């Protein structure tokens, strides 16, 4: 399957990369001379390239095209005729202005799945507003629930709205491709960052609806589960996630406090939520006495979810199953001649 990636920055390129990770031929279309803006987002740099760019553009080929020129537009149309999926994230109407919108390209290739990613959707009063992840984290309420109580707003440490949007885009693309097997027809997909941000709030949004009150910032704590947070040990921080009553019944003996099981304030989770401050104070004294590794090992032995709070270098050493890298992130225009040759233009 061929994917035409005419997107830039994060949400679109990440979606296209996920399709590349699945083994599909992804052609990244970039402006001559500058390319994707993230190529200039640094430091840090790695082998002369932006680390940011490298993180979201593996398993792609790079083609430079000036989509504002008639020649570039014609080459793009040739590619679209031979592609299964197109991903773009220009302002609504941007691709139409170049004769490369859904209406034009679907006439050339009725099987094309055309995915447009924007901040606020293709229609409606906000469609022309500019959008970056930070703005959506703020507007969709994410920054109101992130950080410590009483502290200034904090953004999530990575661009989660962009990443959620990419996952929703891939989900819709794969669904459209499956539907195409039945109907023979492609589809226009309208994926917005705002919709993705609101949908991903899940239980926090439902909590607000249920209570009529906006949730506040709680640091690492959970609004509905106690204890479920970070704790300070003798030499650092770790987390414990007591997400059910059976886990609570294993947790208390494991930490040497079996009497908590019969304490009238802690018998069940609603009571523990109500008396959160009292329980946290008791646990803080206990956990301060031993190092992180001992607590994590002990809790894990008793089947209680627990983990150290790692920095990223430590996290990257954890056992995992990384995506297969068939192609490293391409240099700007690295595959232009190759792709043009495939089109019979060289």
Label the predicted regions.
Residues 166-186, 199-211, 252-258:
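Oxidoreductase and adenylate-handling cofactor-binding alpha/beta cores
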Residues 36-38, 208-215:
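Short Pro/Gly-enriched beta-strand edge/turn motifs at strand-loop
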Residues 221, 226-302, 306:
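Aromatic-enriched alpha-helical interface/lid elements that frame and gate functional surfaces
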Residues 122, 150-159, 181-197, 216-223, ...:
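Conserved Rossmann-fold dehydrogenase catalytic segment
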Residues 1-2, 216, 232, 297, ...:
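Terminal low-complexity tails and localization/encapsulation signals of metabolic enzymes
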Residues 60, 184, 320-322:
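Glycine-centered positions within short beta-strands or beta-hairpins
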Residues 33, 120-121, 193-198, 235-237, ...:
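Glycine-rich beta-alpha junction loops
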Residues 1-182, 331, 335-346:
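N-terminal helix-loop segment corresponding to the beta1-alpha1 unit
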């Amino acid at each position: 399957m061929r994917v035409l990636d005419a997107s830039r920055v994060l949400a679109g390129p990440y979606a296209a990369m996920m399709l590349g990770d699945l083994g599909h031929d992804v052609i990244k279309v970039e402006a001559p001379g500058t390319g994707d803006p993230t190529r200039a987002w640094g430091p840090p740099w790695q082998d002369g390239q932006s680390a940011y760019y490298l993180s979201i553009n593996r398993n792609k080929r790079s083609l430079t095209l000036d989509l504002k020129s008639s020649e570039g537009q014609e080459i793009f149309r040739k590619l679209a005729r031979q592609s299964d999926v197109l991903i773009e994230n220009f302002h609504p109407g941007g691709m139409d202005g170049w004769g490369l919108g859904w209406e034009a390209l679907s006439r050339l290739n009725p099987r094309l799945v055309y995915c447009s990613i924007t901040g606020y959707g293709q229609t409606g009063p906000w469609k022309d507003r500019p959008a970056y992840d930070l703005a959506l984290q703020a507007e969709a309420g994410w920054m109101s629930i992130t950080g410590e109580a009483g502290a200034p707003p904090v953004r999530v440490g990575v661009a989660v709205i962009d990443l959620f949007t990419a996952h929703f885009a891939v989900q819709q693309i794969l669904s459209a491709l499956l539907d195409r097997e039945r109907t023979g027809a492609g589809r226009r997909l309208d994926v917005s960052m705002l919709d993705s941000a609101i949908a991903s709030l899940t239980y926090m949004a439902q909590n607000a609806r249920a209570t009529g009150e906006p949730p506040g910032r709680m640091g690492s704590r959970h609004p509905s589960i106690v204890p479920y947070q970070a704790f300070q040990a003798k030499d650092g921080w770790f987390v414990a996630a007591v997400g059910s009553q059976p886990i609570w019944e294993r947790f208390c003996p494991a930490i040497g406090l079996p009497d908590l099981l019969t304490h009238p304030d802690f018998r069940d989770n609603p009571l523990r939520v109500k008396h959160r401050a009292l329980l946290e104070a008791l646990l803080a004294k206990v956990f301060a006495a031993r190092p992180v590794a001992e607590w994590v090992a002990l809790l894990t032995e008793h089947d209680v979810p627990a983990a150290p709070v790692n920095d990223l270098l430590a996290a990257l050493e954890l056992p995992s199953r990384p995506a297969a890298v068939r192609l490293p992130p391409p240099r700007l225009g690295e595959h232009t001649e190759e792709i043009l040759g495939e089109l019979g233009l060289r």
